[in-house]
Amino acid sequence: MVNEFDKLKAGKLLLASANMLESSFKRTVLVVCEHNERGSLAFILNRPMEFKVCEAVSGFEEVEERLHMGGPVEVDTVHFLHSRGDLIDGSLEILPGIFWGGDKNELSYLLNTGVMMPSEIRFFLGYAGWSAGQLEAEFEEGAWYTAEASKDIIFSDAYERMWGRTVRSKGGEYQIVANSPELPGLN
């Protein structure tokens, strides 16, 4: 496996390697929203929580979609990805057609009036963050891979299969990695 840190940028996927056993990131798929000389910020895509947005986020009482654990940093903050940057001021495009953040009051209004559908948004509690040099060191240790992101992956509900499918899509030796058991020592 090669160190793919140089390929990392906003809009890419970050895939936990099969060697990543730390529970917060084991077999996770994250979308990178910010990556620069100060560090990196991403959201875990395949860690849905048991409760719904309407149960945890004020102003979004009509949103029956599940809330997602974005990462272990600042878990008392709410973040969102969406596909309607044309309607929400302050949105940052992280890849074509996918936006991070923006005005939460506008978002609430657009959802409550039916202009936007809940399927166009993914809500997260917290985020995954790395300071300068930290993520690069983890890549050097073989903890992460990268992959191309897409709207289909970001808004997918196939949580259980997301990591395996995404790693497998890289081809070659990654197909073997994707099929490896979670705890090979128990075989």
From Swiss-Prot:
Pfam families: DUF179
InterPro entries: AlgH-like
Gene3D superfamilies: VC0467-like
Family to which the UniProt record says this protein belongs: Belongs to the UPF0301 (AlgH) family.
Official protein name in the record: UPF0301 protein Ppha_2142
Coiled coil: none
GO cellular component: cytosol
Disulfide links within the chain: none
